[in-house]
C-alpha cells in the first residue's frame, strides 16, 4: 500500500491511500478507430448474406418429423454461433412445439442419449421448466450408456449446467461427464482438435459463457464439423464481421467521450477502464439494434467505477459522508461543500445522467427509468459509506450483514435499470422496472454469484491495501475456519446459486410473464462476471485474459 497527499477544503494535508491501479492496457488505441474510413456497403456480400439467411430459415421451417434431431442440432449451432437473434421467431415456434410434444409424449425414455440431452438443454435455455426425470434411467450406469463418446459426453455436460437444486441425477451427470472429459484431455492419443474443444467446454460451458465470446471461438470449430450446415459458417462469419465493425465504431465514440471528460487525468487515482467498461456492456447485449443501450451502459459503468474507487480507496471518511449527502440531494449547488476532486466528479456524474436523459427523451418510460437510476446510485452511496465505516473501524461483519450489503454494492440494480432504459419503452415498462428494482430472486442470485466470485479472486490484493472485510474474512471469523475451507464452501455456494438462476429464469418466464429479453440481460450480466473473475480480477488487473477477450471481439478480424 502506498499513499499520496492531497489538499482538502480546510487546507490541511491528508495522507490518502492508493491502490496503485495499473494503467490502462489500451491507452488511446481505440481513439485511432475514429480515423477509419466508413465502410461502404458491399451489395454483393449483403445479397449473399440475405440469401444464406433465407436458406437457413427454410431449413428451420421444414416440417418433416424425422428431421427433429437434425433441426435441434441446427438450433444449437445457430445459438452457439451467435446468430440466433436473426431467427428468434422460428426458434421460438419450434421449441414451443417441441415442449408441447415432450410433456405429452410417453416415449421420451427411448431417446438416444444425445438427442435427449440436447432437447433438455434447449428447452431449459428457453425457459421451459422441463422435467429432468429422463436422466434417472442412467443413474448407476452412466459409463455403459455413454461409453466415452465425446459428442455425447459434451452434450451431457452442457445439459447438466442447467440443473436446479435437488436434481440429484443431473448432479451425478455433471460429475460423471466432467471426470470423463478430463480423462479424455489427459489421454495422449486424443486428437488435438478434440482436446481443444473439450478444454474450452470445461472452462467455459455454454450456459455460463458470453454469447459473443462463444461465437468467436465456435465459428472456426464449427466449420470443421463433418455434419455442419453448409449455409451457417459463412453466414456466421459475415454477421460477426458486420457486428464487429459496428462495435469498433462504438468503442471509438466512447473512448473519445471518456477522453473529453478527462477522467483519467483529473481523477488519476481511479481505474482507467473505459475499454473494459464497453466490454461489459457488449457482454450484456451485443445485438445491432441495441447500440444506444451499449453506449448508455458504458457511461454508467465508467462513472460508477470511479464512484467505487472514491469510496473504496481515495476519499477520507469525512469526505465520503459529504459525498453521500450530496448524492441524496442530487443538486449541483452541493458542489461547493465538496473537496476539489469530488466537485469535479459530482458535476460530471450529474452531467452524464442529464446527457443520457436527453439522448433518451423520445422514450416514454425514460423519466421513470432515470429516476430509478438516480435512486440506485444514491443507494450505492449509502452502502459504500457503510463499507467505508466498517473499514475505518476495522469491523468484520457477520456473513448475514455482509451479504445484505453485497446484494446492493455490486450495482446490479443500477446496471439492470440502465439496461432496461437502453432497451426501450416497449420492453422497459414501468411494471418491469418496478420488478427489477424490487431485487427479485434471479437478480439476488446473480448479485451473490458475482460478489462471491469477485471476493475469491481479489480479497488478498484488497486486504493488502486496507479494505473492508470480504466474504472470505467474514466466513473465517464467524465460523473459525481456514481460508482453504472457506474457499471450498464459497465455490459450492456459487454452484448452488447458479442452480437458482436456472430455476428462477424458468419460473419468472412462465409465472410472472417477464420478457425473455429482460431475463437474458440478467443472465448475461452473471455470465459477464463469471468470465471476468474466472482467472483473477479481470477488471482491476485487465492485462491478462480480459485483454485477450477484448482483442478477439474488437481487434482481431475473421477471415471470410
From Swiss-Prot:
GO molecular function (one): alpha-farnesene synthase activity
Keyword Nucleotide-binding included in the entry's annotation: no
Compartment list: Cytoplasm
Binding locations of Mg(2+) 3: 462
Bound cofactor: record note: Binds 3 Mg(2+) ions per subunit.
GO CC aspect terms: cytoplasm
Binding site for Mg(2+) 1: 308, 312
Cofactor: Mg(2+)
Pfam families: Terpene_synth, Terpene_synth_C
Domain notes: The Asp-Asp-Xaa-Xaa-Asp/Glu (DDXXD/E) motif is important for the catalytic activity, presumably through binding to Mg(2+).
Name of the protein in its database record: Alpha-farnesene synthase
Organism from which the protein derives: Cucumis melo
Lineage: Eukaryota, Viridiplantae, Streptophyta, Embryophyta, Tracheophyta
Amino acid at each position: 500500500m502506498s499513499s499520496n497527499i492531497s489538499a482538502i477544503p480546510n487546507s490541511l494535508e491528508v495522507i490518502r491511500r492508493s491502490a496503485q491501479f495499473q494503467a490502462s492496457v489500451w491507452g488511446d488505441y481505440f481513439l485511432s478507430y475514429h480515423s477509419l474510413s466508413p465502410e461502404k456497403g458491399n451489395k454483393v456480400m449483403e445479397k449473399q448474406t440475405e440469401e444464406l439467411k433465407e436458406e437457413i430459415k427454410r431449413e428451420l421451417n421444414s416440417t418433416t418429423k424425422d428431421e427433429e434431431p437434425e433441426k435441434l442440432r441446427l438450433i444449437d449451432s445457430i445459438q452457439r454461433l451467435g446468430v440466433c437473434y436473426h431467427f428468434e421467431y422460428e426458434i421460438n415456434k419450434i421449441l414451443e412445439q417441441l415442449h408441447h410434444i415432450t410433456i405429452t409424449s410417453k416415449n421420451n425414455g427411448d431417446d438416444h442419449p444425445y438427442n435427449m440431452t440436447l432437447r433438455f438443454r434447449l428447452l431449459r435455455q428457453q425457459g421451459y421448466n422441463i422435467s429432468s426425470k429422463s436422466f434417472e434411467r442412467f443413474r448407476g450406469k452412466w459409463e455403459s450408456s455413454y461409453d466415452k463418446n465425446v459428442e455425447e459426453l459434451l452434450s451431457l455436460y452442457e445439459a447438466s449446467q442447467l440443473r436446479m437444486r435437488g436434481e440429484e441425477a443431473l448432479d451425478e451427470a455433471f460429475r460423471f461427464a466432467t471426470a470423463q472429459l478430463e480423462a479424455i484431455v489427459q489421454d495422449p492419443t486424443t486428437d488435438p482438435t478434440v482436446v481443444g474443444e473439450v478444454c474450452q467446454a470445461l472452462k467455459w460451458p455454454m450456459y455460463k459463457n458470453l454469447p459473443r465470446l462463444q461465437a468467436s471461438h465456435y465459428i472456426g470449430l464449427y466449420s470443421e464439423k463433418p455434419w455442419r450446415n453448409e449455409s451457417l459458417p459463412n453466414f456466421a462469419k459475415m454477421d460477426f464481421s458486420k457486428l464487429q465493425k459496428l462495435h469498433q465504431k462504438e468503442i471509438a465514440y466512447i473512448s473519445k467521450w471518456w477522453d473529453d471528460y478527462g477522467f483519467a487525468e483529473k481523477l488519476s487515482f481511479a481505474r482507467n477502464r473505459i475499454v473494459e467498461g464497453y466490454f461489459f456492456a457488449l457482454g450484456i447485449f451485443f445485438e445491432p439494434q441495441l447500440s444506444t443501450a451499449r453506449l448508455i451502459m458504458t457511461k454508467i459503468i465508467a462513472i460508477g467505477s470511479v464512484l467505487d474507487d472514491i469510496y473504496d480507496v481515495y476519499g477520507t471518511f469525512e469526505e465520503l459522508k459529504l459525498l453521500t449527502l450530496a448524492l441524496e440531494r442530487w443538486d449541483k449547488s452541493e458542489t461547493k461543500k465538496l473537496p476539489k476532486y469530488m466537485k469535479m466528479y459530482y458535476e460530471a456524474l450529474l452531467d452524464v445522467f442529464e446527457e443520457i436523459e436527453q439522448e433518451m427523451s423520445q422514450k416514454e418510460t425514460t423519466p421513470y427509468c432515470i429516476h430509478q437510476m438516480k435512486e440506485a446510485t444514491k443507494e450505492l452511496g449509502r452502502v459504500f459509506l457503510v463499507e467505508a465505516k466498517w473499514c475505518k473501524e476495522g469491523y468484520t461483519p457477520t456473513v448475514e450483514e455482509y451479504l445484505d450489503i453485497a446484494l446492493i454494492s455490486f450495482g446490479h440494480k443500477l446496471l439492470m435499470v440502465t439496461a432496461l432504459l437502453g432497451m426501450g419503452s416497449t420492453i422497459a415498462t414501468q411494471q418491469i422496472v418496478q420488478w427489477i428494482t424490487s431485487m427479485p430472486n434471479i437478480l439476488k442470485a446473480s448479485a451473490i454469484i458475482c460478489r462471491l466470485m469477485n471476493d475469491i479472486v481479489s480479497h488478498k490484493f484488497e486486504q493488502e491495501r486496507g479494505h473492508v472485510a470480504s466474504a472470505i474474512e467474514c466466513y473465517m471469523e464467524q465460523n473459525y475456519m481456514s481460508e482453504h475451507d472457506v474457499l471450498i464452501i464459497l465455490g459450492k455456494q456459487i454452484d448452488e446459486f447458479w442452480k437458482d438462476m436456472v430455476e428462477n429464469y424458468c419460473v419468472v418466464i412462465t409465472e410472472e410473464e417477464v420478457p425473455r429479453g429482460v431475463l437474458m440481460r440478467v443472465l448475461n450480466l452473471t455470465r459477464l462476471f463469471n468470465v471476468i473473475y474466472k482467472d483473477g480480477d479481470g477488471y482491476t488487473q485487465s492485462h491478462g485474459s480480459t485483454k485477450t477477450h477484448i482483442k478477439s471481439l474488437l481487434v482481431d478480424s475473421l477471415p471470410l
